[in-house]
């Protein structure tokens, strides 16, 4: 029976490359000359530091652009509020890994409401979709792509 998995993951290598590119771009920007600003990557968390709140938003925009260039979907970013400490502003950005249980229930509900002849099963932080033929699975993929669930999804482990 054909099946595939729906997952929501961020490629850590591409994330590191995007942060490195953003750091390089930061070094060449004229408006950041002589400014104490930086990106720091720890696991799936990025800590941004700048001297001004406006510069912090500029750094987030630089990071979003570099993430897009590297193929990392910006919807997986969870931007926290800016914190002012001393003369610097700090902001944490987390990246969502895995599908939240509430979102996975919404996905299952949406797929079942579409009357496509597939079965959806929640398996931890991923979803397994099984069906009788490939066309039904591709219809389920289209439903997931069209829906706005607030995070990006990848389709893996496609079996015939």
Swiss-Prot record:
List the keywords (alphabetical): Nucleotide-binding
Extract the SUPFAM superfamilies matched here.
Answer: YajQ-like
GO terms, molecular function: nucleotide binding
Pfam families registered for this protein in UniProt: DUF520
Tell me which positions the record assigns to the signal sequence.
none
Cellular component per GO?
A: cytosol
| Stretches assigned to coiled coil | none
The record's section on HAMAP family has: YajQ (MF_00632)
Q: What does this protein do?
A: Nucleotide-binding protein.
The name this protein goes by in its record? Nucleotide-binding protein VSAL_I1728
Q: Which organism is it from?
A: Aliivibrio salmonicida (strain LFI1238) (Vibrio salmonicida (strain LFI1238))
